Every structure is written in C-alpha cells, then in structure tokens.
Amino acid sequence: MWQIEEHRRVDKQLAGSVPIEILKRYEKWKDIARISGPLGLRAIKGFHDENLASEWKGSRSSRLGLQWRVIYQIVADRMLVQVIQVTAHDYRKP
C-alpha cells in the first residue's frame, strides 16, 4: 500500500476555481495511487501518465481532464507518492 503526501500548496490550489468533476477525478487518482502505486497509474490510459522534462525532470504528470494535471514524484524505497501540484495546464508558448 502506497502513501500519498500532498504539498501544502495543493489544498489552496484545489480550494480555488477547480471544477467539481476534476476534484472527483483527483480523489479517484489518489485511490488508485494508494492501492497500486505508479504501475496502476500507468496502466490506466485515461490518465496519460508520463515523465516530465527540463525543470520538472524527475517528476511525473497525470491528466485529470483535457486541461488539468497532477504533478508528482515517486519515492520508491518508501512507497511514497508526493503530490507537488494540481494545475490547469497552459499550452501557450511565451
């Protein structure tokens, strides 16, 4: 059984203008991560779980919807999933 650890910012991010459907998907995502860990998240194609690059190297991302992402890291030796951020992904380039 994996543990889920949320950064203190996550509560503030979720309390904002996050749609209820995204909150439900995030709770389901946490249930899957808690029970089966990163392998379970990768097995469900709807999450489109993937490694991140550049400044987020070492982190992973799962889709909660077309726009929303949960960004997290895995600490395998402690069976821990650290949620860093739940955010509306911005596709605009600077």
Q: Where are the language model's segments positioned?
A:
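Basic, Lys/Arg-enriched alpha-helical interface segments
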Residues: 1-66, 74-94
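Hydrophobic/aromatic beta-strand elements that line small-molecule binding cavities or substrate pockets
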Residues: 70
